[in-house]
Regions:
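HIT superfamily nucleotide-processing domains
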Residues: 1-178
Length: 178
C-alpha cells in the first residue's frame, strides 16, 4: 500500500516531538529544473500570451508574479520592450513602470498585509539578475520574523501559499483600485 504524503500528519508529529518540519515543499522548482531550456526571453513572451501569472498590462509595461519567488507575493514589473539596462529605458517607460510598481505595492499591501517591502532591481548577472537581458523591478513583501534568511543558509525559499491563490488575491485588489 502506498501512503500518500499528509502535511497534517507531519505537523502533528512535529508538535508532538517538539521538532521542526523537515520538508520544504516547492513543486514549481522541479518544473523549472526539468523543463526544456527556452532560449526566448520570458519577459518578452509572457505579456503577449495569456500567462495566468500576469497581474496587469499597460501600454509600456506589465506586472507578473515571480515564478520562483523569494517570499509569498513576490511580483515583478518589466517593460514590454526588450531592454537589459535601466539606462536603456525611456523616461516615459520608466514613469509607467514606477506607477505600476506603486500600484502593485498597494495591491499586495491590501491583499497580504506585509510589514514592509524590498523593491529594487538587479542589473546584470554579477548583481544577481537571474534574467539579466531584460530589465525588471522586484517587489518583495516582507514580514517581521519571515524566513528570508533561508536563501542565504540553504538556497531554499519558504512559500506558504500556492502562487495562483496569491495572484488571485493581488489581482482582486488591483481590479478594486480601478
Amino acid at each position: 500500500m502506498i501512503r500518500r504524503y499528509n502535511a497534517d500528519d507531519e505537523i502533528q508529529n512535529a508538535r508532538r516531538n517538539h521538532t521542526v518540519m523537515n520538508t520544504l515543499w516547492a513543486p514549481w522548482r522541479s518544473e523549472y529544473i526539468t523543463r526544456p531550456k527556452d532560449v526566448s526571453c520570458v519577459f518578452c513572451t509572457a505579456p503577449q500570451g495569456e500567462d495566468p501569472l500576469i497581474l496587469k498590462k499597460t501600454k509600456s509595461c506589465f506586472a507578473i508574479m515571480n515564478r520562483f519567488p523569494y517570499t509569498t507575493g513576490h511580483c515583478l514589473v518589466a517593460p514590454n520592450r526588450h531592454v537589459g539596462d535601466i539606462a536603456e529605458v525611456s523616461q516615459k517607460e520608466f514613469s509607467e513602470i514606477i506607477s505600476l510598481v506603486k500600484e502593485i505595492v498597494s495591491a499586495v499591501r491590501k491583499a497580504m498585509n506585509p510589514d514592509g517591502f524590498n523593491v529594487g532591481c538587479n542589473i546584470g548577472a554579477v548583481a544577481g539578475a537571474g534574467i539579466a537581458d531584460h530589465f525588471h523591478v522586484h517587489i518583495v513583501p516582507r514580514w517581521s520574523g519571515d524566513t528570508n534568511f533561508m536563501p542565504v543558509i540553504s538556497d531554499s525559499h519558504i512559500i506558504s501559499e500556492h502562487i495562483l491563490v496569491t495572484r488571485d488575491k493581488i489581482a482582486e485588489q488591483l481590479s478594486g483600485a480601478q
